[in-house]
Amino acid sequence: AHLHALYLVHHEVWRPLAAAYQHQLDRPIVPHPFRLGDTVWVRRHQTNNLQPRWKAPYTVLLTTPTALKVDGIAAWIHAAHVKAATTPPAGTASGPTWKVQRSQNPLKIRLTRGAP
């Protein structure tokens, strides 16, 4: 009796549910933009104070429509937890330059930041 009731509910619910999700099946799947050999940053989910949010940079070894396998990390990583690592043009500094000024005291130095 219970199995027959379950069968009836299944037939009553399945068709409207399938019709409700049909529009999602008709949409084309848009894969992530990452390809083999790309360099990517991987999101660090648990960060401590002053720790960067992104672990950097890893090379993409394998891809699926939703995940990436990168060199140096054993687990697959969802594409939403990755961003492309851009490399600065050759000969340019990626950040600010620092200048060291020494003082009379050998244990003291002064660091000043210059323009990038």
From Swiss-Prot:
EC numbers for this chain: 2.7.7.-, 3.1.-.-
Organism: Rauscher spleen focus-forming virus (RSFFV)
InterPro entries noted in UniProt: MLVIN_C
Gene Ontology molecular function: any one: nucleotidyltransferase activity
Keywords: DNA integration, Endonuclease, Hydrolase, Nuclease, Nucleotidyltransferase, Transferase, Viral genome integration, Virus entry into host cell
GO biological process: DNA integration; establishment of integrated proviral latency; symbiont entry into host cell; viral genome integration into host DNA
Protein name: Pol polyprotein
Organism domain of life: Viruses
Other comment: The Rauscher and Friend erythroleukemia viruses contain two components. The spleen focus-forming virus (SFFV) is replication defective, and causes foci of proliferating erythroid cells in spleens of infected mice. The second component is a replication competent murine leukemia virus (MuLV) that serves as a helper virus for SFFV.
